[in-house]
Design a protein with these regions (language model features):
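N-terminal Rossmann-like NAD(P)+-binding domain of SDR-like oxidoreductases, especially those catalyzing
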Residues: 1-208, 364, 375
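C-terminal "lid/loop" region of Rossmann-like NAD(P)-dependent oxidoreductases
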Residues: 243, 273-274, 282-289, 296-314, ...
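Conserved active-site helix of classical SDR/Rossmann-fold NAD(P)-dependent CH-OH oxidoreductases
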Residues: 98-99, 185-192, 225-229, 258, ...
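A conserved structural motif in NAD(P)-dependent oxidoreductases
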Residues: 251-255, 332
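Non-catalytic, hydrophobic alpha-helical segments
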Residues: 256, 260, 276, 287, ...
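Amphipathic terminal alpha-helices
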Residues: 23-26, 333-375
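Hydrophobic "lid"/C-terminal helical patch
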Residues: 17, 260-264, 291, 319, ...
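Glycine/proline-rich active-site loop of Rossmann-fold NAD(P)-dependent oxidoreductases
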Residues: 185, 198-200, 210-226, 234-237, ...
Length: 375
């Protein structure tokens, strides 16, 4: 029987990975620190009772050592995410926590045979674009000075023409233009480099925007579908940054879990980052409108001229590589939204945490506003 450790296994993706592995006959151990920002009510009821559960932090050396004992394959999902203003915590959890896990495996000569690490589309600075003159280009992040003028478009780095969004391949430049994105670059590079040095197979899955049942209703810093739903269910308008026409690639969580299992069981992706997504870009405004219609709550989204520096305008994943080995998303956006709404309506005491969080981000300089110019 294969023995797996799922770090972050109480969260959205980790818990679905654990469920899938249990169904497939794996012996599963879950490690999660039950971060209060995500798990405000403590241990969630959905943790699989056929999996061993360890409540603890991967930054604690003894805890991660115990969690790794007799493990064959690690699904490293644990991360601190979103746009929260705690820079040091991102680095401690995402970068140093990952480094410590790798150190412990080597130090104790543990029999780990593979690591699948959760990366993110946030590693890209901006999605790929098609320039009328230069073809596919990889623009840099849009300058703050441009955004302050309300110019949201992405321009060709060679001729400044407005580009058309196209799917972004894995060979696009990475760098991360947010603290979260930067630490996800750290995570994937650490794991892939360590794999090359040790000869232990590793693969980094660059997830698109993942949503579905169990997405935290308490965390106002990440998960646009959850944030919009909690706003609407409190009779508040979803707040759109920029003009709402920015696009994202959305993936249902069960599809992401299947991608993890596929990556664990094939050697065709080893040693590299791999995009996982639907391959389709959807405007954020459309997401807000679909949720409003599905919930039957007629509240138009609010656009107030705010933006977040470093945020990409468009990102759709080029999923050619993972599709070539048999991956195909099963759940489209309409079905996924319907299933998420069924789940969130079953939750109690749904509150709006976004309003307070947005004010914190403004005060911390993470959210900016368009500067109006006189005549």
């Amino acid at each position: 029987m294969k023995r797996a450790l799922v770090t972050g296994g109480a969260g959205l993706i980790g818990s679905h990975v654990a469920d899938l592995l249990v169904r497939e006959g794996w012996e599963v151990r879950v490690l999660d620190n039950l971060e209060p920002q995500t798990h405000r009510r403590g241990r969630p009821s959905w943790i699989n009772d056929r999996a061993e559960f360890i409540e603890g932090d991967l930054r604690d050396r003894e805890t991660i050592s115990a969690a790794l004992d007799k493990i064959d394959i690690v699904f490293h999902q644990a991360a601190y995410g979103g746009y929260m203003p705690e820079i040091a915590k991102y680095v401690h959890v995402n970068s140093l926590g990952t480094a410590q896990m790798l150190e412990v495996i080597c130090e104790k000569n543990l029999p780990v045979r593979k690591i699948v690490v959760a990366s993110s589309q946030a590693v890209y600075s901006e999605g790929a674009g098609d320039c009328p003159e230069h073809g596919m280009v990889f623009p840099s992040v849009r300058p703050v000075e441009q955004l302050r003028k309300g110019d949201w478009e992405v321009h060709c780095p060679l001729c400044s023409a407005i580009t058309r969004s196209v799917p972004t391949p894995e060979n696009a430049p990475v760098g991360g233009e947010t603290v979260y994105g930067l630490t996800k670059v750290d995570q994937e590079k650490l794991v892939l480099l360590w794999g090359k040095q040790t000869g232990i197979p590793t693969v980094a899955l660059r997830y698109s925007c993942t949503y579905g049942p169990r997405q935290s209703i308490f965390n106002p810093y990440t998960g646009v579908i959850a944030i919009f739903c909690t706003r609407l269910l409190n009779n508040l308008a979803p707040v759109l940054y920029e003009d709402g026409e920015q696009t994202r690639d959305f993936s249902f969580v069960e599809d992401i879990a299947r991608a993890n299992l596929l990556a664990a069981e094939t050697d065709k992706l080893d040693g590299s980052p791999v995009n996982v997504g639907s391959g389709t870009g959807t405007p954020i405004r459309q997401i807000a409108e679909q949720l409003s219609a599905a919930l039957k709550i007629d509240i138009a989204p609010e656009i107030n001229g705010e933006f977040r520096p470093g945020e990409m305008r468009h990102l759709t994943s080029d999923t050619t590589r993972i599709r070539a080995i048999g991956y195909k998303p099963d759940v489209d956006l309409a079905e996924g939204i319907a299933r998420y709404i069924d789940w969130i309506r079953s939750q109690s005491d749904i509150r709006d945490y976004f309003s307070e969080a947005a004010e914190i981000l403004r005060n911390k300089g993470i959210v900016h506003k368009v500067q109006k110019t006189g005549r």
